[in-house]
A protein has these predicted regions:
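Short beta-strand His + acidic residue motifs that chelate non-heme Fe in jelly-roll/DSBH
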Residues: 51, 77-78, 98-100, 104-109
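Well-ordered beta-strand positions
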Residues: 42, 69, 91, 99, ...
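A short, N-terminal "cap"/entry segment at the start of jelly-roll beta-barrel domains
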Residues: 1-44, 50
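A short beta-loop-beta micro-motif enriched in histidine and acidic residues
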Residues: 30-37, 51-69, 85
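Glycine- and acidic-residue-biased ligand/ion/polar-headgroup-sensing regions
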Residues: 44-45, 63-80
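Histidine- and/or cysteine-centered catalytic micro-motif in compact active-site loops
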Residues: 43-46, 53-56, 80-82
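A short, sequence-level motif marking secondary-structure junctions
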Residues: 11, 18-19, 55-57, 93-97
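Short acidic-glycine-tyrosine-enriched beta hairpin
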Residues: 81-102
């Protein structure tokens, strides 16, 4: 598994990006309309990314998206529907990233 989108029906609860994910080119995982962007920049040593600004985009935000990076160890994450029903439990390892988008969540270290 490199990238896994976890849904409850049509509702995206989270996206998990495992440490093994190594794109060969610059790639953004999240769609442009997301308030939180996750991207991987791939360039050769010495390459410069020119200073730039992101254009202002007016958005309506419902909820609080979170990005968690597992720096060490393992974490068991349980993802819940908006009705507080368990959808799935996953193990995240060192180097994994999870973007929590909707629904609920709990953690066990």
């Amino acid at each position: 598994m490199s990238i896994e989108w976890i849904k409850d029906g049509q509702i995206i609860l989270a996206v998990i990006i495992t440490a093994e994910y190594q794109p060969d080119k610059t790639e953004f995982i999240t769609p442009p309309d997301y308030t939180q962007q996750i991207g991987f920049i791939v360039n050769k040593k010495g390459k410069t990314i020119v200073q730039h600004l992101h254009l202002p985009v007016e958005r309506t935000i419902v909820g609080t998206p979170e990005v968690l990076y597992i720096k060490s160890g393992k974490v068991e994450v349980s993802l819940y529907s908006n009705e507080k029903k368990l959808v799935i439990t996953k193990i995240l390892n060192k180097g994994d990233i999870i973007l929590l988008i909707d629904g609920g969540h709990g953690f066990k270290m």
